[in-house]
C-alpha cells in the first residue's frame, strides 16, 4: 500500500464514475501512474480480469516505466478518486523514498509472476 497522504499533497486528483474507463489497453497516453485514493478499479487484459485495486493500491506503472502502450484496461468499478503521478514525480519518489521504490518493485514482481503462472 502506498502512503496516499504523502503523495496527495502535491499531486493531481481526478474523479471517475463507476464504469468509466481510466485508460484502455493499447493507449499510448502513458504519462501517469495512478494511486487509488477511494473506490475500486478493475484491471483487465483482453477482457480477462486481472486484478481489483483497492484504496492505497496503484496501477498504470508499467507503461510509465517502459514508455510502451498500456498493457491492460483500467475501469472504475465504483465511483473513485485517483491521484495522478507523472514521470517526473514518479522518478522523484523512487529516488527519494526507498520504501516507495520497494513497493513498486514488489507489485511489479507479483503482477509478472501472476501473469506467467496462468
What is each PLM-predicted segment?
Residues 11-14, 70, 111-113:
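Basic side chains
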Amino acid at each position: 500500500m502506498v502512503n496516499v497522504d504523502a503523495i496527495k499533497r502535491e499531486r493531481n486528483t481526478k474523479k471517475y464514475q463507476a464504469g468509466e474507463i481510466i485508460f484502455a489497453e493499447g493507449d499510448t497516453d502513458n504519462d501517469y501512474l495512478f494511486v487509488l485514493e477511494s473506490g475500486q478499479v478493475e484491471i483487465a487484459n483482453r477482457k480477462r480480469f486481472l486484478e481489483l485495486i483497492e484504496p492505497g493500491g496503484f496501477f498504470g506503472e508499467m507503461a510509465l516505466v517502459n514508455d510502451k502502450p498500456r498493457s491492460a484496461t483500467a475501469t472504475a468499478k465504483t465511483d473513485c478518486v485517483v491521484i495522478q503521478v507523472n514521470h517526473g514525480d514518479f522518478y522523484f519518489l523512487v529516488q527519494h523514498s526507498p520504501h516507495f521504490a520497494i513497493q513498486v518493485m514488489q507489485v511489479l514482481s507479483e503482477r509478472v509472476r501472476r501473469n506467467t503462472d496462468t
